């Protein structure tokens, strides 16, 4: 997102200090100064104060109905939300959201070649479920 145009900005919220540090390092290497801000915060405690009104929201893991509802309430008309997850709970959540609100629901998986003794086989990664919706 930030790399598409120098005027684009993004805010990341991360509860784990190591992941927040990694996000900051990536931002320093991949975006212009000030384009990407990381806030250290546990979203199970609600959204942090002072967030700008989003054009889009991406939840990459740890989604709950309460978090999605809080994000939907802040999302303006025409804003997009995308929720990804790999757990059965996340899949249940996005299937419910898709049933209630519509949007696009998909699952995708990746397999990598790996050794099985002297032979090789496919080793699957966790399947990702994704839901995307635009507030109309």
What are these regions (language model features)?
Residues 7-11:
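Short beta-strand element of Class I
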Residues 5, 32, 75-77:
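Helix-to-beta-strand junctions that scaffold the AdoMet/dcAdoMet cofactor pocket
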Residues 68-132:
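C-terminal substrate-binding/active-site "lid" region of AdoMet-derived donor-dependent transferases
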Residues 1-2:
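Aromatic pocket-lining residues of Rossmann-like dinucleotide-binding sites
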Residues 15-17, 43, 62, 86-88, ...:
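Short, ordered loop/turn segments at secondary-structure junctions
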Residues 39-82:
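Active-site segment flanking the S-adenosylmethionine/decSAM binding pocket
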Residues 13-56:
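S-adenosyl-L-methionine
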Residues 14-18, 22, 66, 89, ...:
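Conserved active-site and cofactor/substrate-binding residues in soluble primary-metabolism enzymes
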């Amino acid at each position: 997102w930030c790399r598409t145009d120098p005027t684009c900005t993004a805010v990341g919220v991360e509860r784990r200090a190591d992941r927040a540090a990694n996000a900051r390092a990536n931002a320093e290497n991949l975006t212009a100064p000030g384009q990407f801000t990381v806030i250290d915060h546990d979203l199970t405690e609600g959204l942090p104060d002072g967030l700008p009104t989003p054009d889009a929201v991406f939840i990459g893991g740890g989604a709950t109905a309460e978090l999605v509802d809080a994000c939907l309430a802040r999302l303006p008309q025409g804003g997009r939300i995308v929720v990804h997850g790999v757990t059965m709970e996340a899949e249940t959540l996005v299937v419910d959201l898709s049933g209630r609100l519509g949007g696009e629901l998909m699952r995708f998986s990746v397999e990598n070649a790996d050794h099985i003794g002297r032979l090789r086989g496919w080793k699957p990664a966790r399947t990702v479920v994704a839901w995307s919706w635009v507030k109309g």
